[in-house]
Each structure stands twice: as structure tokens, then as C-alpha cells.
């Protein structure tokens, strides 16, 4: 369950982002994302009931010690999870725009789920132009930094960074501050081959990263569609249907062993507790509830699934 403080959301100016994420979550339901099932609220909080994903974030599973980095086969499995989740949301007309290890959560079977749609956008190539700078430094694409038009391919740059980070244990574009990171994303050339690739990793993995980290959107792997990524030689042995139906035992790949090994790294991020200071913010809270800002934050997936084309809830009766 995700507990969201109304006051905190108001004070941080995140109401629009929360509404956007809520509306996007209602559109999505897929085996490899964090799905919304129910939402309700009380006077102070909004509660979102999402998939139970106890394995922690991918960030918490990236070890500091190079010898503990994932194997190539493990990385290919994890990346295939991410690719399928991106394929699904892109088919629903959604650009994620914040793909990073913190927004990928493990379930208890060792599969990754895409989460956090707070800055995602609904995209239509015919009439949508997205230029704003959003995302996390170190993972955003060059076109976002330069305020050039964004599209689904912008998500694939972040995918390339994650592959690089899982192999080398660090991001390809680093810096002392946001400006330096952005400068490196725009100008630092990344070219991997069998000579400078990490030991025991293939030249195909190097080629995969090189093509995802192309600076120009139209030259990036996936610019002709996500099937271009799925058919790359590095992923030629991936059984996409079996992964989508979770017929691959991640335990046999050693993924569950990694989750157990690093479970102490799974820090629970606690929301700032406004309950202890709520008196100070009573005026704000009264304003929020009086204006009914969050009036539409009620959702029931079962009812929504059973609606007809006119929005009326129907019941399934035995014939």
C-alpha cells in the first residue's frame, strides 16, 4: 500500500503529478508493472493499493563490489523484463520518462516490475509535442536536455544506461553536479567493444549498449520500433512469450539468490510523517478538503473492469 499525505503533496506542488500518475495507473494493467487495484482516502491521506512487490528496488540489488555484479544471462533476463514493460506502456500511448533502477521493483519470483508514473506522459505522435525537462540526472536522454521533442525512443536511452550500470556497477555519464552530468550525456562518447568490455561479457552486449546510447533519437536502437530492440543479436535467445507469462524460473538463473544476498540493502523509505505536525497544517488541510481537490481519488479495479462502453457496471450472471 502506498500512503500519500495530502498536505505534503500540496506543499511540494505535486498535485498535478499525482493526478496524472493516478489517471495513468487506471489505464494500465500488465504482469510486469506495479498495478493499481484500489484507492481510497481519509481526511489526511490517499491510499493506493498496488501489487505486492517485496523484493526491493533494482537499485538496492546493484552491489558496490564489482565481483558481485550480475552475470550476463541474469542481466539479459532482467532487461527483457524491462523491455516488455516498456512495450506494454508504449502500446498504451505512455512514455515513462523516468526509467532508472529505483523505479524497478522485484516481485517474490524474481521478476522486475516498472513503477512510478509520476512524470509519465500520454503521447500521440500525430498531435503531441513534449519538450519539458523531466527525469533523473544520469538517466535522461540528450533530446530531453536540449528540449527537443520527446517520444517513446527517449525511454530507450535510459534502458541503455541501466544495462551499462548492471555490467560495470556505475553509470556511463557521471559528474559532480547536474550540469556536469548533462554535459557528459551530451558530449561524452561511449563506445564499447570486446577489448574494453567487462570480462566474461560478449561483444553483442557491447553493441547493444552502443546502439541504445546513440545521442540522436532517430539513430538510437528502437527508433524503428521496440521489435528492433527485441530482435538484437544479444537477445536472440530470449523466449519473450515465456517471460511474459512468467514461465521462466528466475530462481534457476540465480536471481532469487541475489535478492536474498542483498536483502539487507532494501531500505524502506518512510514518508515524511505529517501526522505529528498536522496541527500546523490544519488550515491547509481544511482548504484541501473544502475545495475537494482529491475528490476523484477513488478507484476499484474490479468495478472498472466490469464497466460497459457507457461506463455502467454490469454483473456476470450464470446462464
What are these regions, as identified by a protein language model?
Residues 3-28:
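Conserved N-lobe beta3->alphaC-helix segment of eukaryotic protein kinase catalytic domains
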Residues 39:
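Activation-segment/catalytic-loop signature of the eukaryotic protein kinase fold
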Residues 44-57:
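Conserved short submotifs of the Hanks-type protein kinase catalytic core
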Residues 78-79:
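Activation segment signature within eukaryotic-like protein kinase domains
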Residues 223-315:
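C-terminal regulatory tails of eukaryotic serine/threonine kinases
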